[in-house]
Curated annotation (Swiss-Prot):
Keywords: Isomerase, Magnesium, Metal-binding, Phosphoprotein. PROSITE patterns: PGM_PMM. GO terms for molecular function: magnesium ion binding; phosphoglucosamine mutase activity; phosphomannomutase activity. The keyword Phosphoprotein applies. It comes from the Bacteria. CDD domains: GlmM. The modification Phosphoserine is found at residue 107. Its cofactor is Mg(2+). Activated by phosphorylation. This is Phosphoglucosamine mutase. Catalyzes the conversion of glucosamine-6-phosphate to glucosamine-1-phosphate. InterPro entries: A-D-PHexomutase_a/b/a-I, A-D-PHexomutase_a/b/a-I/II/III, A-D-PHexomutase_a/b/a-II, A-D-PHexomutase_a/b/a-III, A-D-PHexomutase_C, A-D-PHexomutase_C_sf, A-D-PHexomutase_CS, Alpha-D-phosphohexomutase_SF. It comes from Leuconostoc citreum (strain KM20).
Length: 455
C-alpha cells in the first residue's frame, strides 16, 4: 500500500471537539472495531484485555465510558487506569501483558478537544496500516463483529495500581535520587497533576508546584509546556535550579533554567545526548530529530562529534527511524523526547528525570548545559485554511518559498507544512537575525493568505 489516506486518524490518534466531531457514538464504534482488530491474535483460551487511561478533561469520562462499552460488547475485558499519562499507558500495556492500550486525551490541545490514542500490545502506537484496517471496519455498511451474550461479554474493573507500577519504573531509570535538587513543577492541570508531587517526593527532591489542580476545564489553560511563562516566573521567585513543564497528557517536557529562560526539546535532546555520548551510551552517536529542530541544535551536535537524522514531524516518525536504524535517543523541539532504552513513546516524566540526573552528575547549572546550543531566531505562523494540502502545493506559494530560500543562501531555512491535527498551514523560518526571520515568514504567509483567501 503506497500511500494510505486516513479519514479519522491523524498524526496522533483520533482527535476532535468532544461531543461534536468526537462523539460517544464514535468512541463506542472505535471500541468495537479497534478492539476487534487489536485483539484478534489474543490467546483463545481467555478473554483479551485492554487497558484504558485518560487525562483530566471533563469529556474524558464520557468518551471513556463509551469506548469501554465498545470493548465489552465484543468480549474484551477492560482495566480502567483512571487519570494517568499517555506514556504510562504505553508502559503498562507491556508490563501487564495486555492485548492493547487506549488513552483518552487531546494532549496539549484546549479542554474542549479530546482524542483517542491506541497502543498495540508491544506498547507502540499503531501503524498506518492498522489504523486503515480500523477505519475500514468503522465505515463498513454493516457491523459484522461478534455480539456475545452472558459470559461472553467483557468485564471492566478499576486498576489504580497502574500508577504505582509506572512510578516505580521511572525511579529505576536513574541510579540516584534527587536529594539536593530544587525544582518547580507545572502539571498543566493535566494527567501529571497527581503523579508529580508523589514522584518527586519519593525521589527526595525539594519542589514547588503549579498547574496541579485540574477541574476538567483548565487543562493547558495558561499553564504547561505550551505556556511556560508562568513557570519561568515561579522559578525565579522560588530561586530553584530548574522548572519542568509538562503537557496535558504528560508525553512532553519543556524546561526552564535557573534564570527563567526556556530550554526546549532541542536543548534537552542535546544535553542528554551529549551526556549519553560521553558515557558511551548514545548509539551511533546520533540523535533523531524532526524537520522542526533548530539549526543551532545541529551545529551543537556537530561541534561535539554527534550527528542527527531528520524525520517528518510527529514522534511516531521519530520512533520509526529509531527502530529502523537502531538509535536510542530522539525527539522533537516541542518536547516529545524518546529514550528508547526504556520507552516506546515520548515521556515527559522520564525526560525530566534524565535531565535532572545530568545536572546532578555534572554539577552544572541548566543554563550552562544548554549554552552550547546557539538558537537561530525562529518564527512559526499558523494560518487557518480550508484545504491545507492544496495550499502547501500552490504554485504561487512554492515560488515565494523558492525566492526566500535563494535569498537565504544557505544561512537559514524555511519549512511550510500542514498541521497533522488541525486545518492549519504552518509557515516556519530560521535566520541569523529576528528582523530577517520576520521578513521571510511574513513574505510567505502573505502569499498563503492571498491564495487561500483569508485575512
Amino acid at each position: 500500500m503506497s500511500e494510505i489516506k486516513l479519514k479519522y486518524f491523524g498524526t496522533d490518534g483520533v482527535r476532535g471537539i468532544a461531543n461534536e466531531t468526537l462523539t460517544p457514538e464514535l468512541a463506542f464504534r472505535l471500541g468495537r472495531t479497534g478492539g476487534a482488530i487489536l485483539t484478534r491474535h489474543a490467546e483463545s483460551d481467555k478473554k483479551p484485555v485492554v487497558i484504558v487511561g485518560r487525562d483530566t478533561r471533563i469529556s474524558g469520562d464520557m468518551l471513556q465510558q463509551a469506548m469501554i462499552a465498545g470493548f465489552l460488547s465484543v468480549g474484551i475485558d477492560v482495566l480502567r487506569l483512571g487519570v494517568i499519562t499517555t506514556p504510562a499507558v504505553a508502559f503498562l500495556v507491556q508490563n501487564l501483558e495486555a492485548d492493547a492500550g487506549v488513552q483518552i486525551t487531546a494532549s496539549h490541545n484546549p479542554a474542549a478537544d479530546n482524542g483517542i490514542k491506541f497502543f498495540g500490545k508491544d506498547g507502540f502506537k499503531l501503524s498506518d496500516e492498522l489504523e486503515y484496517e480500523i477505519e475500514q471496519l468503522l465505515d463498513s455498511p454493516e457491523d459484522t463483529l461478534p455480539r456475545p451474550s452472558a459470559n461472553g461479554l467483557g468485564v471492566a474493573s478499576n486498576y489504580p495500581e497502574g500508577a504505582l507500577k509506572y512510578m516505580s519504573f521511572l525511579q529505576k531509570t536513574i541510579p540516584t535520587d534527587l536529594s539536593g535538587m530544587q525544582v518547580a513543577l507545572d502539571g498543566a492541570n493535566g494527567a501529571t497533576s497527581d503523579l508529580l508531587p508523589r514522584l518527586f517526593a519519593d525521589l527526595n527532591a525539594d519542589f514547588v508546584t503549579m498547574g496541579t489542580e485540574p477541574n476538567g476545564l483548565n487543562i493547558n489553560d495558561g499553564v504547561g509546556s505550551t505556556h511556560p511563562e508562568a513557570l519561568a516566573d515561579l522559578v525565579k521567585s522560588s530561586e530553584v535550579q530548574a522548572g519542568l513543564a509538562f503537557d496535558g497528557d504528560g508525553d512532553r517536557l519543556i524546561a526552564v533554567d535557573e534564570n527563567g529562560d526556556i530550554v526546549d526539546g532541542d536543548k534537552i535532546m542535546y544535553i542528554t545526548g551529549k551526556f549519553m555520548n560521553e558515557q558511551g551510551r548514545l548509539k551511533h552517536s546520533t540523535v533523531v530529530s524532526t524537520v522542526m529542530s533548530n539549526i543551532g541544535f545541529y551545529k551543537a551536535l556537530a561541534a561535539h562529534d554527534m550527528t542527527s537524522v531528520k524525520t517528518a514531524v510527529g514522534d511516531r516518525y521519530v520512533m520509526a527511524e529509531m527502530i529502523k536504524s537502531g538509535y536510542n535517543l530522539g525527539g522533537e523541539q516541542s518536547g516529545h523526547i524518546i529514550f528508547r532504552d526504556w520507552a516506546t513513546t515520548g515521556d515527559g516524566l522520564l525526560t525530566a528525570l534524565q535531565l535532572l540526573y545530568v545536572m546532578k552528575e555534572t554539577g552544572q547549572k541548566l543554563s550552562e548545559l544548554a549554552a552550547d546550543v546557539q538558537v537561530y531566531p525562529q518564527k512559526l505562523v499558523n494560518i487557518a485554511v480550508a484545504d491545507k494540502v492544496a495550499i502547501q502545493k500552490n504554485p504561487a506559494v512554492l515560488a515565494k518559498i523558492a525566492e526566500v530560500e535563494a535569498e537565504m543562501a544557505g544561512d537559514g531555512r524555511v519549512l511550510v507544512r500542514p498541521s497533522g491535527t488541525e486545518s492549519l498551514l504552518r509557515v516556519m523560518a530560521e535566520a541569523p537575525t529576528t528582523e530577517l526571520v520576520e521578513k521571510y515568514v511574513e513574505a510567505i504567509a502573505a502569499v498563503v493568505r492571498d491564495q487561500a483567501n483569508v485575512s
